[in-house]
């Protein structure tokens, strides 16, 4: 009987590990077993660990899925990362894992992703919680700012990816000041 339990446990563990072995552009840490799911999406360059305190409070009542996006905090980078791909892949994750109407909680860039997912896939999402998401910082300081949705950000991406770790940290500190 003990051997059967051990085999069943190993099979379930293996299956649960395969669930998150998909080709998503983010890592997922699952905790809690509540009926309602919450998906936590961190901000730019942040680890999902920024949600640790919140998850510690909610995991007794909710099933928590904490994402860390590709290229941040030890998650392998993508060759061509994009907001659009991340949005579509998070929606795919919700569908494939059969997560019913999760609460999406996003900070900064994660807030933008949360809004985009809820707008495009309202049938997939329950409630949304947005923490400090600013859609366009330039619009705050330039009164006649006009949106240009087809901006080519290649130069900016090249400059950021060419930075060493210290330069990147310094840039983050300057933007937070």
Regions found by a protein language model. Give the residues of each.
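Alpha/beta-hydrolase fold catalytic core
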Residues: 2-39, 59-62, 96, 100, ...
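Alpha-helical elements of Rossmann-like donor-binding domains used by nucleotide-donor carbohydrate transfer enzymes
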Residues: 27, 50-53, 57, 85-93, ...
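Conserved HGGG/HGGXW glycine-rich cap/lid loop of the alpha/beta-hydrolase fold
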Residues: 30-76
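Active-site micro-motifs of SAM-dependent methyltransferase domains
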Residues: 46, 71, 111, 135-136
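Active-site loop/oxyanion-hole signature of alpha/beta-hydrolase fold enzymes
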Residues: 65-105, 109, 120
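Short glycine-enriched nucleophile-adjacent loop
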Residues: 111-122, 128
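Flexible "cap/lid" loop of the alpha/beta hydrolase fold
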Residues: 119, 127-165
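Alpha/beta-hydrolase
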Residues: 166-177
